[in-house]
Amino acid sequence: MKQIAILGSTGSIGTQTLDVVRQHPEAFSVYALSAHRSIDLLIKQALEFNPAVVCIADETYYRPLCEALSDLPIRVLAGKKALAEMVTMPAIDVVVAAMVGYAGLRPTIEAIKAKKTIALANKETLVVAGEIIDRLAKRYKVDILPVDSEHSAIFQSLVGEDMISVEKLLLTASGGPFRNFTLEQMQYVTAAEALRHPNWEMGAKITIDSASMMNKGFEVIEARWLFDIPVDKIQVLVHPQSVVHSAVQFVDGSVKAQLGTPDMRMPIQYALTYPERWMSDVARLDLFATQSLTFEEPDLKRFPNLALAYEAMNKGGNMPCVLNAANEVVNLAFREGRCGFMQMSDVIAKTMEKTMFITEPTYEDYVQTDKEARKIALELLKR
């Protein structure tokens, strides 16, 4: 039986991971759960799954969490340092990195050092410090299995293949709720509109990133590190139906793709059961009901965030870290009504210009870069 730690268990990926566990109680046991501050749901999960340990990142919730679980033999931890230590516990086999944003970097690094298998949903970890993560995974011989639907599709399409035969990766994007909006219309869209994704059910932050196509930019960077492939061999295709989750084109001209209904439990389960496939109750894809599959080139004028992601990756160094930090600032500001939709790209671009560039950053450099870029982005928002 695999012992699982879920970082970010109260978020969209975390709750769907627990759905997978419910389907296969004979195979998976929840050893550890963590949340940022969603204490009520964390308590509910702890009561259902009876983990050995729970951790709340926001230390102000430590006492009420302890009180709520006082009758159970569950160890309660709090704080970012405790979270990074929790993932190294010997009993844990798999760490599901489902935390949102930069906060997922340190615990993922510690889990790799402890030689845990990583089921990676936190794409920001590879965006911020892909080179370090790649180096550590190779050093400690740790498997990093993708949970993102697109990267899982590529991963599945590569089974039995040699990377030398890969011509390019085809990364699909739904285009989000504003795919058919004009540039003028996009100036006035609201957070409420952006949060209505046409195909996928996700958390608030990633849904906004999807609407701005920054999420797809992050996925390009993530794919570069996961599959050790140059960025110029990663092509983004807008595919509104979200049926083809992504594909691989080979040197002989053939293309392998993974298709399915838009349900994150599929890639989550595959990451947990790889290399095997197990039964699942997700809805089956009805190809007779699928009227058409269409593909378009992304419009970089209306979605400049995708171009900024390519620019950051091509420049390298700490620039993807700058991209991520600035995006986290403007994403929250947009959700809170302090930033316009198209203004987000402007702030990110200017932050990339103003933040000190470091060619070969260390972990400490990434920490400082994150702080500097956030400060610059916040100052730009005030103007």
Can you say where each PLM-predicted feature lies in the sequence?
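Catalytic, metal-anchored helix/loop core of enzyme active sites in primary metabolism
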Residues: 1-383
